[in-house]
Amino acid sequence: MKWPKIRLRRVDVERVLIACSAALVLMLSVRGRNMETEPYEEPLEQIPVSETAASASAKALQQTVVYYEDGDGYLVPVQRDVERQDGIAKATLGLMVQSARNDMDAARLGLTPVVPEGTTFDLDISQGHARVDMSHQAMETADRAQEENMRTAIVWALTEFDTVKDVSFLVDGQKRSALTHGTDISGSYTRVGLNQEEPAQETFAGAQEIQMYFPAQDGRLLVPVSRTIYGSDDVATAVFEFLRGPKTDSGLETPLPEGVQLLGVSVSGGTVTIDFSSEFVKIAEQSDGGVQAIRALMLTCTRYPGIRKVKILVDGEPYQLPTQEVPTFANVASEVETQYPEVMTIE
């Protein structure tokens, strides 16, 4: 199956290549000196590959959620397996800092880290509040958009942990009102406004924010989008907004076929049943058979409390979905890397 190419900014790829080249030169230099000075030793007995693999797999792992940026400027949550450790929240922030290793890990997914290179963190979590003390390198973002993404990514990454409800910021131990390009860091921040769509008009009292998922154009990742609505924040409203799709200039894919209509939404016993018009069957013509579109719909629905399953009808008749498994997370690093091998292009 042929998948669209991933777009990476040239500056990101150049940073990775420069760092890797420097590391290679240093390694060869050290190796050359060792060859000149060290006496010959008998090679050590080779350890069977099966034993080393077993040793590696025996390491205790835990899951964490890292927020990266894609080529269109969206923040994308990715679930990664990391070695079990104390201070996992601080370690998660470290994975979002630009470096040779982090850049390469993100590039495999078509993404980039959001925190400037060299940034370090001190983290204090108490009674549901996380205070993040960033080093001065955090002030070195390229522009306001990257700065806002950094703040939002840190807040959302930390509030993935049950022990954190809100986040505040310091820079080099000092309270600041704003970052270099004007992004406010004077208050405490919660999980709102992830990839917020620009409202079509000025918002008024009664506005609410709902979150949906849409496929990225390369087909590999699902991107969460926050949309302002007027009305009830319930699963029926979410399905209706999902059917409308992303904004035309968003860079995201419209998940459902053109012309499909919503005939009804009902909830019973933890299952939401959605009835679409006959045009829905064209979803099977998508390059992946509609798998990512269905996963996006399932994630949009199951984020509502009590909903655990999604059932699709077409003109009132049951429709066999291309995937029956309800995803537990939008993007799992190991799955993205293995299921959707890609060729990266440089812009």
Which positions does each model-derived feature cover?
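Bimodal "functional hotspot" detector
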Residues: 1-347
